[in-house]
Amino acid sequence: MSLIVLGTASHVGKSMTVAALCRALYRRGIPVAPFKSQNMSLNSYVTVDGSEIGIAQAVQAFAAGIEPEADMNPILLKPKGDSVSQVVLLGRPYKDVQIRDYYRETDTLLAEAVSAFERLRSRFGNVVVEGAGGAAEVNLYDRDIANIRLARSLRLPIVLVADIERGGVFAQVYGTLALLPEDIRPLVAGIIVNKFRGDPGLFAPGVAKLEELTGVPVLGVVPFADIPLPSEDSLSIADKRDRKTGTPVRIAVVRLPRISNFTDFELLEEHVAVDYVPPGGTLSGYDCIILPGTKNTVEDLAALNRHGVGEELRLARERGVPIIGICGGYQMLGRRIVDAGIESENPAEYAGFGLLDVVTAFTGYRKTTVQVRRRATGPGPILPAMGEVDGYEIHMGETERGDLSEAFAGEGASTPDGLVFGTYMHGLFQNPGAANALLAYLAKRRGVAFEPVTAESTALGAAASYDDLARHFEEHVDMDAIMKYFIDRRSE
């Protein structure tokens, strides 16, 4: 069997709930797969076969002990700006669409999503489905293929997740249930109150009141837990709290308007202060500056130029501050970007920041999506110390390198001193070797002690984190009530 996890709003903990359920089933030896029909996120992941899906579904797949695949997130929307999103269908670029045009295709896309779900269910037996945003968006009911229309098609039991941390949990739950369509409301089998601060037992009267008001059982009150797993979307940036506020080493990640895959830096956040600095914020005083990925290189480059970021980068370069570009950030560090109307409406040529001798051309609607393993081969104090690294590429455009040294075998570029380099490789600094190489140099330059990164880590978190999440969830949720919705094929 299967169930659907819906939420009262965005960022209430649906993704973590699905990951926890997947891990809990995995720990019981029960096969399960995650599923989200439609995800809107700029944090994505590349599967073994080169399919692109939302990073949350990849996290959930690894929690379930299986490889991520396209059917787990058949529709991925990647906002490009001005109400335009790239639609990734079954792991491959489909087209760029205005939101109004997208809504005209929801019947077809829903059919694709249901087919993907059925393929997963036929193979795994159990599927944990995640909704999107808030379930009770009444103005979208006729085109909501991630919540209401999907629930209507699948007719699965629903668990509703609410976030008590932001306040108003009674209104969240009662209002959502009251607004659900009459044919959907009876499917709601339970409520989970998430992100409680303090002793959950103190909310016992609240549990009783919720059950009295709604007639739906509360399956658990889950305390807030700071378990290191990748973030799904840019809402998470605002919630980031410096875990290492006392460290003298500080890294600036330029918060691009269309920042993507900022999960690249979450391992670094565990060890030094990482600030996400918006355009217009100062970059002076940092030990390292990173330009991350973006869904629209041309538009975000223009935004940085409007705020004088290029001059700040040149001054940082004069001070010997390491400057690193990842994916779109790598493209921006080059001399020139030639766009044939792929990134913007009209063909044009744009000057980059000129710190790397590379030129990027967008000549066709082709996307590179591939997992990679490379050895760092560049010069200087950082790159040679990285060793072999794993990651993945997700990018439009092709970059030609001038006479500069390559940063990684066959890819990337570096200045002769190795203090400015760029790569298309996402997940670079999720490799402990790469993180140690950077942090050791920054600590030495700052004149402070360096504590190496030793924890097991992958691009999507350590297995221990998944286990911690499952244990935390199971401790506070009525698992007996939930387990009746899943089948154990071992007994068949």
Swiss-Prot record:
Pfam families per the UniProt record, alphabetical: CbiA, GATase_3
Membrane-crossing segments per the record: none
Domain GATase cobBQ-type: 248-434
Entry-linked InterPro entries: Class_I_gatase-like, CobQ/CobB/MinD/ParA_Nub-bd_dom, CobQ_GATase1, CobQ_N, CobQ_synth, GATase_3, P-loop_NTPase
Endpoints of the signal sequence: none
Pathway assigned in UniProt: Cofactor biosynthesis; adenosylcobalamin biosynthesis
Protein family according to the UniProt entry: Belongs to the CobB/CobQ family. CobQ subfamily.
Record's function text: Catalyzes amidations at positions B, D, E, and G on adenosylcobyrinic A,C-diamide. NH(2) groups are provided by glutamine, and one molecule of ATP is hydrogenolyzed for each amidation.
Name recorded for this polypeptide: Probable cobyric acid synthase
